[in-house]
Amino acid sequence: MSAPISTIAEIGKHEGQAVTVRGWLYNLRESGKLLFPQFRDGSGVIQGVVPKNAVPPEVFDAIKGLTQESSVIVEGKVRADKRAPGGFELDVSNVQVVQRVSESDPYPITPKEHGTDFLMEHRHLWLRSLRQAAILRVRAEIIRAARDFFDSNGFTLTDPPIITPAACEGTSTLFPVDYFDEEAFLTQSGQLYIEATAMALGKVYSFGPTFRAEKSKTRRHLTEFWMVEPEVAYGTLDDIMELAEGLLTFLVKRCLERRRADLQTIGRDVTKLEKIEAPFPRITYDEAVQKLQEGHAQGALENKFEYGGDLGSPDETYLSSQYDKPVMVNRYPASVKAFYMEPDPQRPELALCVDVLAPEGYGEIIGGSQRMASHEQLLKRIHDHNLPEEAFRWYLDLRKYGSVPHSGFGMGIERAVAWICGLEHVRETIPFPRMLHRLYP
């Protein structure tokens, strides 16, 4: 194989030239003396054309004998064809079979309908499908875009620990770890730690895995997921709502610019994403409750929402389906939110917090707040929540030595991917999802 190597994604740069493509057989169709193999290489799929009278017999026979997912190196001339996916085809002239999948043990995910349990059990192979590969490329783009957004806006990436000391927010949804005979837990959030780095660096963000031992089986829950969490010294609730608005519009725009073809492969209606631009609607918790109670009265919600409760998945789904942009629900009752949130000075029973609900019924993808700045108030809140003061001694120190107003939020990568890709379930948003009853593969 003497022709230069090209990825399928960049094959259009070589129109009229011979190239080498390294990948796998995705599909093979035969029509008389013509073979139409489809090759994939991770960057895309291209159709090859193999006329029997145009290649040596051994090349034709080798391609004809290929089985699904056999690994191959093919050489051919790139030809433009508007009818072809991607706009190009490959006139194959040579092939090297790296490994032929055995017919006695064929590739298990054949081109037919398979149940979800079967596909999840074979997740390591399901990733090779066009749809799953497209989702993972969109995921990578979202992560890259989030980093670019914060890096270009003066934020410093800081890395909080994944193993944390005992009982930071209660242990009911934490995964315990035996840490050299000390009790420790896998992190639920890097927030407390990046509050500390924000006091050192001003504007910071973290990106990493988080773990929640919640026995939830909803389409929105994973036990292991990834979050991007910014924190801003001297930042207010309004500041982070504006920041969240900027981040989400940036992510959507980037995916439309760079991953439109992948979104179309997934079947996403991109016209809905094209509507995502600032400003986003903002409603208070009180206004949200009114909308939910009206929805119940109209028969759209089964249960009547009672004031003072936190929003559940059906409530978020209903509210977010009322808008074609993300909606920012702010100022929840402090009693249903985390202990560290600053109270609203106008109504101290409310917290200066926000949940950003993605449209089309996708619900919460961002949660954030202004953090409590007073040492005395924070200490009281820790006691009120029956949390161990000693575990938070370092966190309380942040309020003793130059405390300032500060704010931040967390965005779940998987929920953002689900929304932008238009997916029904978050299990498709990460290569190997961890769920209540899913630890393999």
Regions found by a protein language model. Name each.
Residues 262-277:
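Short, highly charged C-terminal tails/helix-capping segments
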Residues 140, 144, 161, 267, ...:
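An alpha-helix initiation/capping motif
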Residues 173-253, 275-441:
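A translation/RNA-centric and nucleic-acid-associated enzymatic feature enriched
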Residues 157-159, 263-264, 329:
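Cytochrome P450 heme-thiolate monooxygenase catalytic core
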Residues 58-61, 261, 290:
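Polar/charged alpha-helical tracts
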Residues 2-233, 418:
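Class II aminoacyl-tRNA synthetase-like tRNA-binding/catalytic domains
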Residues 250-264:
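Flexible helix-coil linker/hinge segments at domain or subdomain boundaries
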